[in-house]
């Protein structure tokens, strides 16, 4: 029940992006989520791709073509792993700098969210209490009908459904009334939170124009440094791919020639 109430509060205030604020555990930072998702994605693609290559090479067609795709795949995986190892520290430095530059703004927004949370908590408690009462009332009204279903014959099923239908409609209407009341109570706080965020961003833009310019300059500088530091690693990747692609091309041409000879000899 509490999960329903908390979800409604999130939707009324700031949308789905505020879901971590209402949780007790400290949420993972956006930078850590991006890095973890990227790592998991690359690992899944790499492992899954190798399985497909291995299955193809073990098939009759793969053995006949003898393209040595698995060896090429391992060489490519080694080259990509080397690239990730070289770029990793540079990428980490970029995320750390960006997180540091936005620390003040995030702290101010956390304070605003905490203040709004304290103000709306009584409304959430009241809504939870009313909803619990409505559900309990519905359960009490339905209980005799459930006993009637167990005791009655099959022909009474339609009659029972007709009796249940208005009760369900009544519960939905009551729930809708409570939800509308809660939305009306929380709307000023959601608007207040949005206004505070807009005001802080506007103040940062007007009174701290130099700070925004500095943020953009630093971000541009970090990206330029990332591109420069990544160039050697990307060049190593390109050089590592060339022999792999050439080996694949030669193997494929040889397989095609062999197949052509077999067809001509038949």
From Swiss-Prot:
The modification Methionine sulfoxide is found at residue 109. Sequence repeats lie at residues 67-88, 89-110, 111-121, 122-143, 144-165, 166-187, 188-209, 210-231, 232-242, 243-266. Participates in the reverse transport of cholesterol from tissues to the liver for excretion by promoting cholesterol efflux from tissues and by acting as a cofactor for the lecithin cholesterol acyltransferase (LCAT). As part of the SPAP complex, activates spermatozoa motility. It is found in: Secreted. Residues 1-18 form the signal peptide. GO terms for molecular function: cholesterol transfer activity; phosphatidylcholine-sterol O-acyltransferase activator activity; phospholipid binding; protein homodimerization activity. The gene is APOA1. This is Apolipoprotein A-I. Homodimer. Interacts with APOA1BP and CLU. Component of a sperm activating protein complex (SPAP), consisting of APOA1, an immunoglobulin heavy chain, an immunoglobulin light chain and albumin. Interacts with NDRG1. Interacts with SCGB3A2. Interacts with NAXE and YJEFN3. Gene3D superfamilies: 1.20.5.20, 6.10.140.380, Apolipoprotein (1.20.120.20). Belongs to the apolipoprotein A1/A4/E family. Residues 67-266 are annotated as: 10 X approximate tandem repeats. GO terms for cellular component: chylomicron; extracellular vesicle; high-density lipoprotein particle; low-density lipoprotein particle; very-low-density lipoprotein particle. Its main location: secreted. Glycosylated. GO terms for biological process: acylglycerol homeostasis; cholesterol efflux; cholesterol metabolic process; lipoprotein metabolic process; phospholipid efflux; positive regulation of cholesterol efflux; positive regulation of phagocytosis; positive regulation of phospholipid efflux. Keywords: Cholesterol metabolism, Glycoprotein, HDL, Lipid metabolism, Lipid transport, Lipoprotein, Oxidation, Palmitate, Phosphoprotein, Repeat, Secreted, Signal, Steroid metabolism, Sterol metabolism, Transport. The keyword Glycoprotein applies. Pfam families: Apolipoprotein. The keyword Phosphoprotein applies.
């Amino acid at each position: 029940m509490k999960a329903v109430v908390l979800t409604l509060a999130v939707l009324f205030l700031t949308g789905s992006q505020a879901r971590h604020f209402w949780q007790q555990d400290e949420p993972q930072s956006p930078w850590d989520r991006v890095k973890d998702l990227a790592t998991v994605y690359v690992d899944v693609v790499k492992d899954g791709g190798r399985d497909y290559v291995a299955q193809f090479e073990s098939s009759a067609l793969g053995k006949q073509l003898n393209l040595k795709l698995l060896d090429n795949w391992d060489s490519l995986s080694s080259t990509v792993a080397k690239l990730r190892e070289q770029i990793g520290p540079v990428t980490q430095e970029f995320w750390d700098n960006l997180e540091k530059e936005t620390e003040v703004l995030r702290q101010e927004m956390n304070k605003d969210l905490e203040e709004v949370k304290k103000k709306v908590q009584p409304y959430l408690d009241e809504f939870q209490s009313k909803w619990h009462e409505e559900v309990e009332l519905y359960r009490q009204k339905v209980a005799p009908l459930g006993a009637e279903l167990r005791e009655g014959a099959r022909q009474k099923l339609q009659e029972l459904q007709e009796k249940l239908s208005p009760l369900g409609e009544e519960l939905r209407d009551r729930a809708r009334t409570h939800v509308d009341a809660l939305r009306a109570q929380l709307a000023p706080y959601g608007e207040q939170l949005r206004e505070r965020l807009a005001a802080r961003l506007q103040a940062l833009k007007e009174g701290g124009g130099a700070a925004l310019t500095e943020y953009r300059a630093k971000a541009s500088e970090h990206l330029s440094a990332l591109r420069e530091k990544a160039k050697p690693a990307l060049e190593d990747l390109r050089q590592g791919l060339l022999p792999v692609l050439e080996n694949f091309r030669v193997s494929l041409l040889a397989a095609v020639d062999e197949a052509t000879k077999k067809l001509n000899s038949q």
